[in-house]
Swiss-Prot record:
It is found in: Cytoplasm. Belongs to the class-II aminoacyl-tRNA synthetase family. Its EC number is 6.1.1.6. This is Lysine--tRNA ligase. It catalyses: tRNA(Lys) + L-lysine + ATP = L-lysyl-tRNA(Lys) + AMP + diphosphate. GO terms for cellular component: cytosol. One of its GO terms (biological process) is lysyl-tRNA aminoacylation. The gene is lysS.
Length: 503
């Protein structure tokens, strides 16, 4: 079968017929040689060649006959008389190949003409410029390294079905340059965060992913079982209590970038497993943590976007200016100036207003919890530019240090950008007796039906009894940070393999 009739007929076949045809080709190759060789050694990448030689003129480049060995996936292929062109794609970009019967043997050319889009090839040759000025490899030898048995998505339509993008991320990455760039940026963002922390003299650590007691946040855990020990274990909902144990042990600045797991609903902002950074610094407080969070985010934006003034969903976001700071009540009043102080301290009025804004009533009946629920319904979504909401109520902050000057409040903040939470931090509670009482209060809430309330962690109390220095701590959601800095609206677009219902 010649290359001329195969591209004309394959698109008319259904997928199963195409796969069968390609399997037949693979079987023919197997009869002649190793179908999956592993001895081709490339020495060049497409983007590096484009950067080094792309601006050199044809008359200057052609005489140099620069030798290259390059490999990648064949994305385009066409014949023009006795010559054939192909475009291959590697991790850095694309480059064109040129073959004719003067440069390669007829046997090699015949083999190439039977290959398909999606096949992975290795080519050796020299660089030249076409008459249109396109940097091209004049091929002297080319080999099939891996056969693609399934057809790629249409080159014009790409992979447009969202669910298929998430289920078959490998195809999405092949077909969509935007997706590849997103995950390259994600890696760069994480590296930027890590470099910043190291520059601040923090030590990167790893703490357990399976906990005997779920803790560090108010959320439902995933439960598993350890057969040898015959005990239940919980996938961590947060690393906080282990990291603070390390501060007790004298590791005064620690951070961890890793996964946490919460057995809760999925949405455009929530995936059951997600990546976050948590960091803790001895002899620090929530003021220092707010500045750290601000600097980390600003630095990451500059690293991947070249600026801290970005656009999200068509609207500007100012990450360059100092982040605004508001209390919960100040934020409520900013967007609802008609509310009075009397109303905002009336439990029954708050409950009615919370329901009116479509929020659920909190398990804890305290005024602070009700004010927070109202904030979430009437103000949170309006915080577009970065805003720290500070001084959270004690009843919803079981691990935060109580304020010395504001009764019933803690030295806690949450950072909101584009209407959603991005970070959470506080001056850590370091009084073991106070912490024990708060754990008991959480247990009472759990007994009363609050599934997300914390357990009593006796070992953490024991660690605190050795003395936890004054400490500040903070957690930043990496997935949401990537969404912000890549202008993407759903968390599934920034997680390589998001959780999906079974097919």
């Amino acid at each position: 079968m010649s290359e001329q009739n195969h591209p004309q007929t394959e698109p008319q076949l259904d997928e199963n017929q195409i796969i069968a045809l390609r399997r037949e080709k693979l079987n023919n190759i197997r009869q002649q040689r190793n179908a999956y060789p592993n001895d081709f050694k490339r020495d060049s990448f497409a983007a590096d060649l484009q950067a080094q030689y792309g601006e050199i003129g044809k008359e200057e480049l052609d005489p140099q006959a620069v030798p290259v060995k390059i490999a990648g996936r064949m994305m385009l292929k066409r014949q023009m008389g006795k010559a054939s062109f192909a475009t291959i794609q590697d991790v850095t970009g694309q480059i064109q190949l040129y073959l004719n019967n003067k440069g390669v043997s007829q046997e090699v050319l015949d083999g190439f003409n039977h290959w398909d889009l999606g096949d992975i090839v290795g080519a050796e040759g020299t660089l030249f410029k076409t008459n249109h000025g396109e940097l091209t490899v004049r091929v002297s030898d080319i080999r099939l390294l891996s056969k693609s048995l399934r057809p790629l998505p249409d080159k014009h339509k790409g992979l447009s079905d969202q669910e298929t993008k998430y289920r078959q991320r490998y195809v999405d990455l092949i077909a969509n340059e935007e997706s590849r760039n997103t995950f390259i940026k994600r890696s760069q963002i994480i590296q930027s965060v890590r470099n910043f922390m190291v520059g601040e003299h923090y030590l990167e650590v790893e703490t357990p992913m399976m906990h005997p007691i779920p803790g560090g946040a108010t959320a439902k855990p995933f439960v598993t079982h350890h057969n040898a020990l015959d005990i239940p274990l919980y996938l961590r909902i947060a690393p906080e209590l282990y990291l603070k144990r390390l501060v007790v042990g004298g590791l005064e600045r620690v951070f961890e970038i890793n996964r946490s797991f919460r057995n809760e609903g999925m949405s455009v902002r929530h995936n059951p497993e997600f990546t976050m950074i948590e960091f803790y610094e001895a002899f620090s407080d929530y003021e220092r943590m707010m500045q750290m969070a601000e600097d980390i985010i600003r630095n990451a934006s500059r690293t991947v976007n070249g600026t801290a003034n970005i656009t999200y969903n068509g609207k500007e976001v100012d990450l360059e200016s100092p982040f605004e700071r508001l209390t919960i009540l100040e934020a409520i009043k900013k967007y609802n100036p008609h509310y009075t102080d009397e109303q905002l301290n009336d439990a029954e009025w708050l409950k009615k207003e919370i329901v009116k804004h479509g929020e659920s009533l909190p398990p804890s009946p305290g005024i602070g919890s009700l004010q927070l629920a109202l904030f979430e319904g009437c103000a949170e979504g309006k915080l577009w530019n970065p805003t720290f909401i500070v001084d959270y109520p004690v009843e919803v902050s079981p691990l935060a240090r109580a304020s010395d000057t504001k009764q019933g409040l803690t030295e806690r903040f949450e950072l909101f950008v584009v209407g959603r939470e991005l970070a959470n931090g506080y001056s850590e509670l370091n009084d073991p007796e106070d912490q024990a009482e708060r754990f008991k209060s959480q247990v009472a809430q759990k007994d009363a039906g609050d599934d997300e309330a914390m357990h009593y962690d006796a070992d953490y109390i024991r660690a605190m009894e050795f003395g936890l220095p004054p400490t500040g701590g903070c957690g930043i959601g990496i997935d949401r940070l990537v969404m912000l800095l890549t202008d993407l609206q759903t968390i599934r677009d920034v997680i390589l393999f998001p959780q999906m219902r079974p097919e």
